[in-house]
């Protein structure tokens, strides 16, 4: 019985109209799937745009200097640097020049405020601490607000917990998927800490 069915199927496949029918059905299925995927993508894109316009995320970020709930004589800082640290007032200092209250010692000549050393015009920097310090410049407020508005949907889970300018710069300057070309390769292996809107320029691997 199986041999008979196989024989009949082979004979059918030899006929051109059967092959044409199979090809036609396959083509229709392919086109239908492609159009459905495109419609779904357009619908999702429109939905995100509507959500952006009609339901803006209530960002908690405050850009006023000194808006921390901590005592005014205390500073938060970037903590992780082995050699450099940035405090919430935008000062960059060597770890040995960090005061007991968490602030950089501004009396030390090497301590600089709003320092953009090693930072490019696109907002990408060689060192994390300089990225945070440069990002804390009051003039960067409009850039950061624009980023928050444009990134509302894609990054809402990450940035909803951010409450002020300092926390935003700490989060923004950390290396992200925008900085990565491949899994273990940076787009720009030198200036990989970015506070700007655009990803680093793509360098050849």
From Swiss-Prot:
Membrane topology: Single-pass membrane protein
Gene Ontology CC annotations of this record: Golgi membrane
Residue positions with a glycan: 67
Regions of this protein lying in the Lumenal compartment: 36-205
Main localization category: Golgi
Topological domain spans for side Cytoplasmic: 1-16
Transmembrane regions: 17-35
UniProt key word Membrane: yes
A biological-process GO annotation: positive regulation of SREBP signaling pathway
Key word Metal-binding present: no
Localization: Golgi apparatus membrane
Family: Belongs to the SPRING family.
Job description of the protein: Positively regulates hepatic SREBP signaling pathway by modulating the proper localization of SCAP (SREBP cleavage-activating protein) to the endoplasmic reticulum, thereby controlling the level of functional SCAP. Plays a crucial role during embryogenesis.
Assembly behavior: Interacts with SCAP.
Name of the protein: SREBP regulating gene protein
Species lineage: Eukaryota, Metazoa, Chordata, Craniata, Vertebrata
